[in-house]
């Protein structure tokens, strides 16, 4: 809060807690102070809406109505015409001079007033609060008391009409008008009331009085008459709740009018109807997006049309896209009856090929052909297509899709290419001949030696010798029962036993063709523990007992 100390009949000094509240030049401060003439201190509130002071002030800012008649000619302590030294004030330059602007300002100068207003009245209570020239460029940015905004009251007209007239003072606002404020302004309007033209028609565009503002900058903003209006965050329009969905009105907040927006139910029904009509007319989502761009200049992607039909767009975007789709749907319906240019435009987009449905008996023939030969040649495809009365492309695509399906349902194993060639489509786990078995075992030992070298094991020879003793594989002529004393398993060419899915399938169907027996219990496991299991492991976990189905075992339980 700014305080003014009355120093004498010719000089005054201003002490302020705000640096921009008009301190004098420091070099002249000591010469102006006269302690013997200092009287009481008074407060100097400065309102941002200074021109509205002519409508009246709150009662706490001055004497009551009864006191005005008896004290109108009494000089209250403060800044009056008698206490102003115009010669001294004329030597003080304004901080924001129109010619000087922001340059060459002394370091010890913050803000200086040129002089008092020429037509200021001898009313010290009023003058002590409003003594700035209306042309001062910072008149709207001076300190403001807290109660100016907290009491939510405008300056009343009925107070100052008795003593102060608006025409006798210069307007302190940057925006000036010759019209008076309306006296029938509601008292419940606060300073945060939004500018709504329909409610207050008397608030008009005003003309600038300061050369810092030009016509172009004025056109970019709207000010009410001699007021700075803040947004009304408290009384802002509340969102409307429609069908359990929260949507905000998209109307103009200045005019106070809102558009008639569809509800969420309307959008949902339209999206459902649009999708049905589009499919019935034979157009894809990409066709609609391309047609909108060709007809109306707004190109939309297939994803946008898809999200509209699925109600995955925002409410605002759904409202914008709906009229365009309505126009397109109307054109599409009319073109179905009478061919127009719309058909030519729609024909430019790529048509989706119809989905081919294959009968059950034809599909069974294709399945049997696939089991015999999964990758038929072009000649085989042509002959099969002619036999089944299908297009060649349909048969080719079916075999491609069937091979992809086979990859998904059949587990892939890390085996040698030679072993892969021996696997048939119906029995992927076929047996090998004796020569192939010997080669497989030899490859397993070679891989074992390489792994030991990589890990830097010192007992390389010991493990290699024990590996020869631990495994003896022989081919069984007949299927092996799960109750067999020895454990049934299969050795792959890579030396790695298949995963648990294969082991379960192998045990359930008894198709395994190899038997692991005579395993040295004290032998050291190979570097790949999944490849071979000691006999004690199977006995300990009771994997094969009493003719029950073997359980899937965890590799981490191995000893």
From Swiss-Prot:
Pfam families: Homeodomain, Pou. Residues 259-333 form the POU-specific domain. One of its GO terms (cellular component) is nucleus. Its main location: nucleus. GO terms for molecular function: DNA-binding transcription factor activity, RNA polymerase II-specific; RNA polymerase II cis-regulatory region sequence-specific DNA binding. InterPro entries: HD, Homeobox_CS, Homeodomain-like_sf, Lambda_DNA-bd_dom_sf, POU, POU_dom, POU_domain_TF. CDD domains: homeodomain. Signal peptide: none annotated. Keywords: DNA-binding, Homeobox, Nucleus. The keyword Acetylation does not apply. PANTHER family: POU DOMAIN (PTHR11636), POU DOMAIN PROTEIN 2, ISOFORM B-RELATED (PTHR11636:SF89). This is POU domain protein 1. It comes from Dugesia japonica (Planarian). The lineage of its organism: Eukaryota, Metazoa, Spiralia, Lophotrochozoa, Platyhelminthes.
